[in-house]
Amino acid sequence: MPSMYGLPAFVSATELLLAVTVFCLGFWVVRATRTWVPKGLKTPPGPWGLPFIGHMLTVGKNPHLSLTRLSQQYGDVLQIRIGSTPVVVLSGLNTIKQALVRQGDDFKGRPDLYSFTLITNGKSMTFNPDSGPVWAARRRLAQNALKSFSIASDPTSASSCYLEEHVSKEANYLVSKLQKVMAEVGHFDPYKYLVVSVANVICAICFGQRYDHDDQELLSIVNLSNEFGEVTGSGYPADFIPVLRYLPNSSLDAFKDLNDKFYSFMKKLIKEHYRTFEKGHIRDITDSLIEHCQDRKLDENANVQLSDDKVITIVLDLFGAGFDTVTTAISWSLMYLVTNPRVQRKIQEELDTVIGRDRQPRLSDRPQLPYLEAFILETFRHSSFVPFTIPHSTTRDTSLNGFYIPKGCCVFVNQWQVNHDRELWGDPNEFRPERFLTPSGTLDKRLSEKVTLFGLGKRKCIGETIGRSEVFLFLAILLQQIEFKVSPGEKVDMTPTYGLTLKHARCEHFQVQMRSSGPQHLQA
């Protein structure tokens, strides 16, 4: 007979056992996924996720946008789940600085993601989860090698440093190449030629050699790097849902294949360097690392050996730090120049006033060219083409803004949100280089430091200084000599596509013309 509450009066033992089992399983799942939080702290807030996939649908194809919207609702420290993995998302400049700079030791780790283990056989200095003394010593070595063969001066050259020499050579070649293409075809895709010029600069620094633009070896490097960015752009759910690693996955297979090709290619180049190496005659970064490898010690303060494999992985990390970011930065710059001709004219007027046409721009001219610097900063900010840093992880239990974050927690840092924060910029969607200038026309250093693109703290991009200098000099030399525009009636698509870096649609309708006055062949 029915009970007074409309439920059956009698329940079978099987039904009762099933109900208890379901309740216990549910209780266990809740307990297992719930983190113990110390007294006085809170768990980071966030939306409810779906079983198994967590917030993967919420994050979607444009994580920088969806996570920015969530930060407006939940604050600068929020938590989502990708699969069953909790991920803390940091937004807001002050919060990110607090985590990565003031609490840098707490947040300097890398998560042990499956895809990271596939990059240079899991030995990459950039992606490896190691953040101890060995990692720190290798990072110092890489920084010193990069500085020696870029910022250091070449006594046999008229240029102020190796970087200036290599960039000047490539920028001038690029001007000639674009003129030739214009004469033959009448329009072009600048990325096609720019990417080879930038690759040549980092090849000269890493391997001591420059390639012709149609050299198959150089083109293979460029193609591999482009494919790497395209493949990684799709992301890897297998990083957060382990069972997917054992299922057919074309993207993951392509990622493995690309890493194997890149590693083999670099290994071949470095093997040739070992064959021709002469102690005391250091030609490039690879030679410098080989010398340290043979000395078997990174520095006098670290009893750490440098194996032959580590030489390959460090060179790969340096190549990556100096290639895709610079190419993407200059490519976006050209897009903003053709869509903002007034800005292009102002840059060229500044170049004419400060430098003239009788000599080429040099790195030492940077302080005297504030409008060009402001344009570059606004390109970095508005495009935010590195929307997130490489994921961080916590090295120990810690807290941030009153929220508890346990050891080993994966942390996303939303740089795009910082660069589009209305509280910082007022009109973040407007492209306006003048925002970085003071009333007297000088660069506003306080505001320029708020642009976030290369990360912060102990995992900051080691190629930042080189990259900024390279972007400046390429643009200064190009804009001194030529004017960029698009074919009449053609529109430029500035919509970014999400990936390792945000890429705009390729445009095949660029045109250039030599500027109307001044000599075409300038003194370096």
Curated annotation (Swiss-Prot):
Keyword annotations: Cytoplasm, Endoplasmic reticulum, Glycoprotein, Heme, Iron, Lipid biosynthesis, Lipid metabolism, Lyase, Membrane, Metal-binding, Microsome, Mitochondrion, Mitochondrion inner membrane, Monooxygenase, Oxidoreductase, Steroid biosynthesis
Primary location recorded for the protein, binned into one broad class: endoplasmic reticulum
Topology in the lipid bilayer: Peripheral membrane protein
Names of required cofactors: heme
Places the protein is found: Endoplasmic reticulum membrane; Mitochondrion inner membrane; Microsome membrane; Cytoplasm
Catalysed reactions listed for this entry: an organic molecule + reduced [NADPH--hemoprotein reductase] + O2 = an alcohol + oxidized [NADPH--hemoprotein reductase] + H2O + H(+); estrone + reduced [NADPH--hemoprotein reductase] + O2 = 2-hydroxyestrone + oxidized [NADPH--hemoprotein reductase] + H2O + H(+); estrone + reduced [NADPH--hemoprotein reductase] + O2 = 4-hydroxyestrone + oxidized [NADPH--hemoprotein reductase] + H2O + H(+); estrone + reduced [NADPH--hemoprotein reductase] + O2 = 6alpha-hydroxyestrone + oxidized [NADPH--hemoprotein reductase] + H2O + H(+)
GO molecular function: arachidonate monooxygenase activity; demethylase activity; enzyme binding; estrogen 16-alpha-hydroxylase activity; estrogen 2-hydroxylase activity; flavonoid 3'-monooxygenase activity; heme binding; Hsp70 protein binding
Biological process per Gene Ontology, one example term: camera-type eye development
Annotated EC: 1.14.14.1, 4.2.1.152
Alphabetized CDD domains for the sequence: CYP1A (cd20676)
Induction cue: By 3-methylcholanthrene (3MC).
Protein name from the UniProt record: Cytochrome P450 1A1
